[in-house]
Amino acid sequence: RDAGIVNQLRELIEECGAKRTLVDIELTESCFIEDEKSAIDLMRQFKQLGARILLDDFGTGYSSLSQLTRLPIDVIKLDRSFITGIDQNYQSQSLVRSLLGLARAFGFAIVAEGVETEREMQFLKDIGVDYAQGYFYSKPMAPDMFEAWVADKKKLRLIA
């Protein structure tokens, strides 16, 4: 809705010297309800800056599969309601497998939100989900704690 937001992002990227490809813009389905045309135009401008567009909480709101053919998105984030207990829920497994196939057909990556157990993580890994996030990996933390956590993870990768 703020026409200057693209310029603000451009300025921030230049100020910080950030790699444009590291910028992700997460939008929920509700962003497209009032004015889909303007939202699509805004997403294209973000993409021209190198940002990836992520559709957050997919499948929980006003989603229409036809939107996937119109929206310039890169990633679909599956809501945790599909993920919780997926290792034991065959209906959720079928749904997520279907969404994964659909995402592949459109060239989208998939993020599974709300992964809390090793069994959920393993199932998602086995079916080829691209990314996962949730308490299984880490609880929310302050920026300084995050930096220490990342540094520790890098050390573990070097050892392994």
Predicted regions located by residue number:
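The catalytic core of metal-dependent phosphodiesterases that act on cyclic dinucleotides
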Residues: R1-I86, L102, F106-P140
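Conserved N-terminal phosphate-binding loop of PLP-dependent enzymes in the Aspartate aminotransferase
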Residues: L95
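Divalent-cation-assisted or electrostatically stabilized phosphate/pyrophosphate-binding catalytic cores
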Residues: Y90
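C-terminal helical cap(s) of enzyme catalytic domains, especially alpha/beta-barrels
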Residues: K125, M141-A160
